[in-house]
Design a protein with these regions (language model features):
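N-terminal module-boundary/linker segments of secreted carbohydrate-active enzymes
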Residues: 25-47, 58
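Active-site mouth of glycoside hydrolases
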Residues: 42-45, 50-188
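Bacterial Sec-dependent N-terminal signal peptides
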Residues: 1-25
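Generic marker of residues within folded, mature protein domains
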Residues: 15, 38, 104-106
Length: 188
């Protein structure tokens, strides 16, 4: 178990490094009680959280009690329609849930930032599925989705906040928002 901790820590650290990111490398930071840009100008974030896209959260689709997390929802879909159709469903979900026109609309409504709730399984395999014990297998899907959103946000001068909402092992006991599977090792 201890040899897997570095993977979790490294992945969390990498996501933390790019928490407040704008594609032209304009980072935000804290200055006293304010958030400021690279020039020290105070920034008031008017953000929209884009949840339920890269991480399905039961409370967001009125399914609390029907399933405890995305992992269980996916299992139920597979039981109904099979693995291949489930993968097709998720591919369509990810490719169509947020599109450029959505980001354009957010900008026109006055938003200057979006927060993406991320699931680790779009970036790397679960520990138990790694082909080489202790190695990282990087998946491209999550990076492609982020690249698209960052590109759309750049053209609209919108900041992107990356939130690793579902870390490997799930953080905390609230599987409703972290996709924690109690049958697997927990982050904490």
């Amino acid at each position: 178990m201890m040899k897997y901790i570095p993977k979790k820590i490294i992945f969390g650290f990498l996501i933390s490094l790019i928490l407040f990111t704008k594609i032209d490398a304009q980072y935000l930071k804290r200055s006293g009680k304010d958030i400021v840009n690279d020039q020290g100008e105070k920034i008031i974030l008017r953000a929209m959280g884009i949840g339920n896209w890269m991480l399905q959260e039961p409370y967001m689709i009125n399914a609390v009690g029907a399933y405890s997390g995305q992992w269980e929802f996916k299992e139920k879909i597979e039981t109904l329609i099979g693995e291949e159709r489930t993968e097709n469903f998720y591919e369509n979900w990810l490719n169509n849930f947020v599109i450029k026109e959505d980001i354009d609309s957010l900008s026109s409504w006055g938003f200057n930032s979006v927060r993406l709730a991320l699931h680790y399984n779009l970036f790397t395999l679960p520990i138990e599925e790694e082909p080489v014990n202790g190695e990282n297998t990087w998946l491209t899907k999550g990076f492609e989705l982020i690249d698209n959103v960052v590109s759309w946000c750049e053209s609209n001068e919108i900041y992107v906040i990356l939130d690793l909402h579902a870390a490997p092992g799930g953080q905390g006991r609230d599987s409703n928002i972290s996709d924690r599977n109690p049958s697997k090792p927990n982050l904490w």
